[in-house]
Amino acid sequence: MNVFLSKSAEEKLLKLTEYLLEDWGSKAKKDFINKLTEKINQIALQPQSCPQSSAFKNLYKCVVTKQTTFYYRIVTNPKSIEI
């Protein structure tokens, strides 16, 4: 299934990766991007593999690291996943 980032998610991801690079170095940024990519691949193959949000119906919660979580929804037309 196709996975795409909302405009807000793109902006937040850019800020996060800049922070990681500036404060923690290129290895931390690379490690985070690898973990994020694994999670995106996971939900692309198995969209309902993460738990549904208890606060919002139709949202799923995906934990990337202890400090980082993203929420996504499954879009039916066209069939895709929005982060």
Predicted regions and their residues:
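Basic/aromatic recognition patch in beta-strand/loop cores that engages polyanionic ligands
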Residues: 37, 48-83
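Basic, Lys/Arg-enriched alpha-helical interface segments
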Residues: 2-59
